[in-house]
């Protein structure tokens, strides 16, 4: 019986394998040969869906990492009645994920996939830089707009600058992921999250 072709499933397999490959080896170090082997397809099947490696990288950003930011930050903060409580929950959830995931496959050894792409590819390719800029802007706006709404309802201090606070939180999360993959020590992540948690608590009116 001939095998039924499923283009959507094939494309998804390629993206999943590409995400893992780029996360572990970087975009430039990522191997098309390893991707097709991991996906169980031919190079012809891969290039049927993606014109080249850059297009594949763009798709990973658009279809994997953008939704991840939406899931972790944008959706929880959207119309949040108490943004400080939501930020508490996000930080707690993030630390729990790092503690429970396989270290060699996750943040502890590999860092943040968005940060990895940003550091490696933003200086080299405008398509990557623009997409990454959009991701960071979305992340930043989700925090700053939530804090502004919190100020309007007096659950966030009126004397803080939501834009600056969002910049700080994005920076500490991104920075901890980047430095953390060098230290490869759980204690480092715990310390960074603890500092972020202390700072979040300082946003509550006294």
Where do the language-model regions lie?
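Helix-turn-helix
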Residues: 2, 13, 17, 21-63
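Amphipathic, non-transmembrane alpha-helical scaffold segments
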Residues: 15, 61-65, 129-140, 166
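Residues in soluble alpha-helical coiled-coils and helical-bundle/repeat scaffolds
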Residues: 51-55, 59, 78-81, 122-126, ...
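Short secondary-structure transition hinges
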Residues: 89-144
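Structural signal for membrane-spanning alpha-helices in multi-pass inner-membrane proteins
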Residues: 120, 175-178
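C-terminal peripheral helix-coil segments that are non-catalytic and often amphipathic
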Residues: 1, 89-101, 137-155, 163, ...
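Hydrophobic alpha-helical connector segments
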Residues: 59, 74-110, 162-169
């Amino acid at each position: 019986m001939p095998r039924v072709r499923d283009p959507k499933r094939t494309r998804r397999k390629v993206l999943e394998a590409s995400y893992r490959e780029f996360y572990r080896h970087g975009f430039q170090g990522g191997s098309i040969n390893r991707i097709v082997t991991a996906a169980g397809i031919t190079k012809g099947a891969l290039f049927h869906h993606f014109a080249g490696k850059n297009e594949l990288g763009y798709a990973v950003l658009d279809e994997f990492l953008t939704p991840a930011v939406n899931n972790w930050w944008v959706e929880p903060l959207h119309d949040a009645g108490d943004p400080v409580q939501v930020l508490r929950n996000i930080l707690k959830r993030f630390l729990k994920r790092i503690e429970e995931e396989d270290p060699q496959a996750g943040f502890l050894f590999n860092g943040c996939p968005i940060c990895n792409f940003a550091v490696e590819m933003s200086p080299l390719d405008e398509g990557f830089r623009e997409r990454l800029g959009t991701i960071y802007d979305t992340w930043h706006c989700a925090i700053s707009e939530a804090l502004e709404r919190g100020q309007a309802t007096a659950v966030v201090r009126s004397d803080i600058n939501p834009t600056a606070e969002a910049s700080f939180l994005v920076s500490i999360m991104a920075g901890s992921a980047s430095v953390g993959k060098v230290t490869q020590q759980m204690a480092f992540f715990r310390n960074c999250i603890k500092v972020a948690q202390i700072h979040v608590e300082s946003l509550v009116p006294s």
